Amino acid sequence: MPFSENLIPLSEKKLIYGVKDKPGIFVKAFPFITTNKNDILMEIELQNIGAHLGLSPPILNTYEDQQHYYIVMKRIKGMSLADYYGENKMDIPNWVWKELHRIIRELFINGIEYIDITPYNFLIEDETEKIYVVDYGHAKKVHMNWFVQDFLNGIKQWNPDFA
């Protein structure tokens, strides 16, 4: 059980922890009693896709003990949009909304429908103001039509299936 004895709670509700003497990582815990392991594995798979696209913190490791499944992630030096700007949608700058639309669109183009769009699920990095999406618990895989995907990626032609 690496890290278990060194976990520092960052959030009571979400079971998010820092790790003593390891400032570059954080841990998300899933209690087995309330979470289906297949749902956890799907969340890991979807976040790995997001990380590959540069939209989410990379998952560094996973492990489990008798009560929890843990996801160990790179810690983003920043805070949630809720902590940075507050919860009021009117206080969120236009550039942030544009970036959120781009992120959700990019995920969708890559087969992920991300619906948990709240200021708590997006982190803004301190130095670069890059925005990351986290918490893929309500996300799901979607299959996009090959032509629609190509079209959204910039192809300039009509759908040959309907020509």
Locate the predicted segments by residue.
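Short beta-strand micro-motifs within the conserved protein kinase catalytic domain, predominantly
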Residues: 58-69
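ATP-binding glycine-rich loop module of kinase domains
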Residues: 4-41
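C-lobe/activation-segment region of protein kinase-like
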Residues: 125-163
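Conserved short submotifs of the Hanks-type protein kinase catalytic core
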Residues: 68-80
